[in-house]
Amino acid sequence: MSSIDPKQFGKVAVLLGGNSAEREVSLNSGRLVLQGLRDAGIDAHPFDPAERPLAALKEEGFVRAFNALHGGYGENGQIQGALDFYGIRYTGSGVLGSALGLDKFRTKLVWQQLGIPTPPFEAVLRGDDYEARAKEIVAKLGLPLFVKPASEGSSVAVIKVKSADALPAALIEAVKFDRIVVVEKSIEGGGEYTACIAGNLDLPVIRIVPAGEFYDYHAKYIANDTQYLIPCGLTADEEARLKVLARRAFDVLGCTDWGRADFMLDADGNPYFLEVNTAPGMTDHSLPPKAARAVGISYQELVVAVLALTLKD
């Protein structure tokens, strides 16, 4: 990778922590990002919006931000809007792409409209008759199902439901986290994959093989028995085709520069996109560093390359 003069970045804030359900993940990501940037000679400093007002960024002379916040206001367009207001360049998507990318329900509506394959689903609202909706959904989608709060990341409160009797309780649990819940048909037979996006870097698709039922919060950030397969087992042509489709799934939401698109394959190899992530985890368990490392890009090189995307017009 080409060398970049660290001085051109100016004073950089690494946004970490925040007050979402993913605070601990964000703190872990942010600390590693901070170290990577500092090791590259960049004038980087930690900044936790849960502890300090955002106005301090401008007051203290920050000109750029690496967004390592996950979920909540760090990923739903609010932080992005504030940074735009203060004239501070930042990593990742802007207001629209961030807001839409975090909202699984509206993401799937856009994908349906534009022909991006996504699993069949139903939406349940807080306050609905959960017993009645559960019966309707099982009749329409069958089993098994995934129940997901529309706007939580890191698989927070995602529940796999295998029996009709278990669905009402899963809905009651999920609406504690969001007023809209997505109930999605489980795609079986071909495995789970992710395509990492970082500007023009050509990163490999990763196949994810969790030891448990699915790739949940524990598998993502705690367990050491999740398998990450690179190469992912697809042919070169299949992988190239899925990278193009993943980029399109990302782009049509207004997402830019940096993120991830997650998808399943069915038994016939057909892809179904689940969600995008516009502020991916950057812990030692996270997927973008693994994809980068597989093609000879170090953690430090990756975070500098992502930050460098803020230099373009």
From Swiss-Prot:
Catalyses which reaction(s): 2 D-alanine + ATP = D-alanyl-D-alanine + ADP + phosphate + H(+)
Superkingdom of origin: Bacteria
Cofactor: Mg(2+); Mn(2+)
InterPro entries linked: ATP-grasp, ATP_grasp_subdomain_1, D-Ala_lig_Van_CS, D_ala_D_ala, Dala_Dala_lig_C, Dala_Dala_lig_N, PreATP-grasp_dom_sf
The EC number(s) this enzyme carries: 6.3.2.4
Residue numbers binding ATP: 138-193
List of residues binding Mg(2+) 1: 262, 275
GO cellular component, one term: cytosol
Residue span(s) of domain ATP-grasp: 108-308
Binding site for Mg(2+) 2: 275, 277
Sorted UniProt keywords: ATP-binding, Cell shape, Cell wall biogenesis/degradation, Cytoplasm, Ligase, Magnesium, Manganese, Metal-binding, Nucleotide-binding, Peptidoglycan synthesis
Keyword Cell wall biogenesis/degradation: yes
Pathway(s) per entry: Cell wall biogenesis; peptidoglycan biosynthesis
Database matches in PANTHER family: D-ALANINE--D-ALANINE LIGASE, D-ALANINE--D-ALANINE LIGASE B
Name this polypeptide is given: D-alanine--D-alanine ligase
UniProt source species: Paraburkholderia xenovorans (strain LB400)
Taxonomic path: Bacteria, Pseudomonadati, Pseudomonadota, Betaproteobacteria, Burkholderiales
